[in-house]
Amino acid sequence: MSQWRITADFSDDGNPITSNWELADTDGYGSLGSNMTESSGVFTFPATGIYFIQFITSHTADNIDGLLQIQVETTTNGTNFGGASEQMCGISRASDANTFVTSFVFDVTNVSTHKCRFVVASVSSDTTTHGHSSQNETHATFIKLGDT
């Protein structure tokens, strides 16, 4: 099990989110087993198995009716990513803080080809996705449930 987070805010799109990822390092953080690895927003699994992936995002919008799409994207060939789980999210009032969640259970049969990444697609302008370097705001959790 491991958690990764975005360390800085970004505006509008992160399609996909390619930068500012870090392994959680807050005091008391615990992981179990080997950690995921990340390069340019693409996550590699440490071993084959069935994994629960959860993506939690934190947002504000400067205008009313901010609309976002968040996704877990996966690939089984190492190249072509597609949406495995998505959530359409509305922000109904300017400056409201919102948290959204999507998740997916991924059968990783080959660690060289089975990978994932995360998307925040802003349909409306003036939305901010929040990150932080010392606590989890926008973050991903990976839990190995068992063998494939």
Describe these PLM feature segments:
Residues D12, G83, F106-V108, V120, ...:
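Generic detector of N-terminal low-structure segments
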Residues S31-L32, T48, G82-S85, A94-D96, ...:
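A short linear-motif detector with a strong N-terminal bias
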Residues M1-G66, V72-T76, S125-T148:
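Terminal (often C-terminal
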Residues W4-I6, V72, M88, A94, ...:
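Positively charged, low-complexity intrinsically disordered regions
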Residues G49-H59, T99-S103, T113-A121:
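Extracellular beta-strand-rich recognition modules
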Residues T37, G78-N110:
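Glycine-rich strand-loop-strand elements at beta-sheet edges
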Residues A24-D25, Q87-G90, S112-R117:
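N-terminal start-of-chain detector that recognizes signal peptides
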Residues A47-T48, E73-N80, D107-K115:
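A short, structured loop/turn motif at beta-sheet edges
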